[in-house]
Amino acid sequence: MQRIGVFVCHCGSNIAATVDVKKVVELAAKEPGVVHAEDYQYMCSEAGQAKIQEAIKEKNLTGVVVCSCSPRMHEATFRKAAERAGLNPYMVEIANIREHCSWIHKDMEEATKKAVILARAAIAKVNLNTPLQPGESRVTKRALIIGAVLPEFRQPWISQMQDMK
């Protein structure tokens, strides 16, 4: 079983105005493997990242779930913070409760229910994750085309493939 920390961001009022952040923390704390759960105004800030790093070290966390905004925006931020604290960065999962809950729901109860579901899904994923290691593979610049090619497209393909040699 993993030792998971769950961190729920208010994103100022972006999330907290529609999602009951305290309720998400309370229910996430009861999930299997969760040994730490807390909320903070801006998890992506230096202070927010420091909270994650402190919890990783103090609670010996093996996985982290951040309930915040889009992974596209801050997944790298949280993975780097976890890595600086000694945690494999691929043991960090993001539950996008801003775009998927607070921005699309007007009803706080519905938005909160959905945020809890997303948090639980991310926690379940971390419980099943294993640390990954980045690697490199050699790539051979070849292609095999199977099927008929229209005559007007044939010549450009052949010349491009000959250039690859």
Q: PLM features: residue spans?
A:
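Residues forming the flavin
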Residues: M1-K165
